[in-house]
């Protein structure tokens, strides 16, 4: 089974926030951890706290082309942004965009016309766009309808917030957006949204089942956001899906754990078989 993590962060600077461990998480460290967990490859989402993270992502994908690909970010309000979008796929390992509008100076992009020029260019490029967060998701329905050939990926279960008592708060329309064939969902970061739970995080199982019923296994992508998981090992994040969800068929698991993502992003890594995973 090809196992591709739909989201990790790699960085070599020291700007990381506490919930990501603060110290750098390098490509070499990730490869060793992936081998131990039985993970073949991963999509790196360069962290926005590090202004130089796209550079490190390109370097990492160049050194390990069968282990890492990248959904990079860019400042859409810069004059050079349209040309960068047009040339995005020419960068080694760059297979998509990730737009969250999380910074204060980005929050107007969905309504000030910025996304109106970006999305047609992204659609023309053929590269998927990962969208997430409370400033972006309210506009997904409009964008999915306006740009039927744009592959949209919802970040982290379609999350718009998180609280200690409610855990994961999804956008209320996440399930209904499944009617758009160009919308998919990353099942990433789950254990971090179940901090009061423990492996196998049964509080998440019903959410996963509802997304499965809505989207099917062809539009769901397993992932971890591993540097944020303090209550779960990488191997446990794998086995939660491969061993603890009995309603998934073997074909479902093959799709959700990597095959569906490979098709959606048109990325076919061919890594050597990872080392045998350690017991969880």
Q: Where are each of the predicted segments found?
A:
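Hydrophobic faces of well-ordered beta-strands that scaffold small-molecule active sites
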Residues: 3-8, 42-44, 70-72, 95-99, ...
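Alpha-helical scaffold segments that flank or form the walls of functional sites
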Residues: 19-45, 53-63, 86
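Mid-to-C-terminal alpha-helical segments outside catalytic/metal-binding sites
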Residues: 1-6, 23-41, 210, 214-221, ...
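Conserved, mostly hydrophobic/aromatic
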Residues: 7, 34, 57, 97, ...
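Catalytic metal-binding/acid-base residues of hydrolase active sites
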Residues: 9, 48, 158, 190-191, ...
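Glycine-rich phosphate-binding "P-loop"
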Residues: 12-24, 45, 95-110
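Active-site gating/metal-coordination segments in enzymes
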Residues: 51-135, 142-144, 186, 190, ...
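Catalytic pocket-lining loop regions of alpha/beta-barrel enzymes
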Residues: 108-221, 269-280
